[in-house]
Amino acid sequence: MTSPLITKAEVNSVFQGRSLLAEKDFTPAEINYLVDFGLHLKALKQQNIPHHYLEGKNIALLFAKTSTRTRAAFTTAAIDLGAHPEYLGANDIQLGIKESTEDTARVLGSMFDAIERRGFSQKEVEDLAKYSGVPVWNGLTDDWHPTQMIADFMTVKENFGYLKGLTLVYVGDGRNNMANSLIVTGSMLGVNVHIVAPDSLHPSKEVMDIANKFAEKSGAKPLATSNIEEGVKGANIIYSDVWVSMGESNWEERVKLLTPYRITMDMLKMTGNADNGKLIFMHCLPAFHDTETEYGKEIKEKYGLTEMEVTDEVFRSKYARQFEEAENRMHSIKAIMAATLGNLFIPAVPEDFK
């Protein structure tokens, strides 16, 4: 008597096979689960406990933008999980130039078990997910930065032990992908996110509408304001990002607008939490806090500034958590990869979390 053929087993997981393209694609409980899973995997790593959930898997890493943290995090995370990562840069494949995104997605989806994409267009990463047939992870687009969010809120939870009710203040260009992702993710998780920026650099109405919709359920109080004192009052986390991106031509206008919003020790004191152990500083990096880089020297030469979005004093202070945050990129990305590709038993996630 011959045995019946074994068909593909059903995997009882709320994450298996899903793509992470934007935070709002997941529920607040699912985002929180990934945060906690990242903390768990970090503990396993620290104790040298193997966790090869992706043994035999092949991962395509597609980069249209240069990267230090995202590339290093995806590479080491994949290897720790037992997978093989393959880096394909802008000179290796040219989505939409020599081959359409759809055609590229179909080819890569037939060879790889999952795809990471760091680029510009949100539609492009969505099309990769639509046509590849495998999980796609957004390593950054002009609109959203979801993998960074898991790392960021891991870092917050590590430092405070909880999320709900905390206040995170992002100071800088409120229109960029980091501001978008922070205010939406914070509103999902019950964190009050304030965007402190000039009026012309506030998040779009569409982004604020998404944040406010989640805030109705979580109790968070998202805010966009140009008033620094109002915005930073009561902050537990002061967060910053670069003011300008490489290749932009409008540095001068942006620098003039944002110079009053540089994060200083005086700004930290405005929070009211600088002396009680309830305040940290975070930055997704790279940071222009001195003149030790070519761009730092160029900024000094053009604008007479030795510091940009944050002073060197704050960057090197007892409040600084940016390198802990950077390390957490690896652990959080590992959580995303394992949850969506590792055939893990995750039939449900707790709806209640703190």
From Swiss-Prot:
Gene name of the record: arcB
Annotated GO MF terms: amino acid binding; ornithine carbamoyltransferase activity
InterPro entries: Asp/Orn_carbamoyltranf_P-bd, Asp/Orn_carbamoylTrfase, Asp/Orn_carbamoylTrfase_sf, Asp_carbamoyltransf_Asp/Orn-bd, Orn/put_carbamltrans, OTCase_ArgI
GO CC field: cytoplasm
Biological pathway: Amino-acid degradation; L-arginine degradation via ADI pathway; carbamoyl phosphate from L-arginine: step 2/2
Cellular localisation: Cytoplasm
Species assigned in the record: Lactococcus lactis subsp. cremoris (strain MG1363)
Keyword terms of this UniProt record: Arginine metabolism, Cytoplasm, Transferase
Protein name: Ornithine carbamoyltransferase, catabolic
Cleavable signal peptide: none
The keyword Transferase is assigned to this record: yes
Residues bound to carbamoyl phosphate: 67-70, 94, 118, 145-148, 284-285, 329
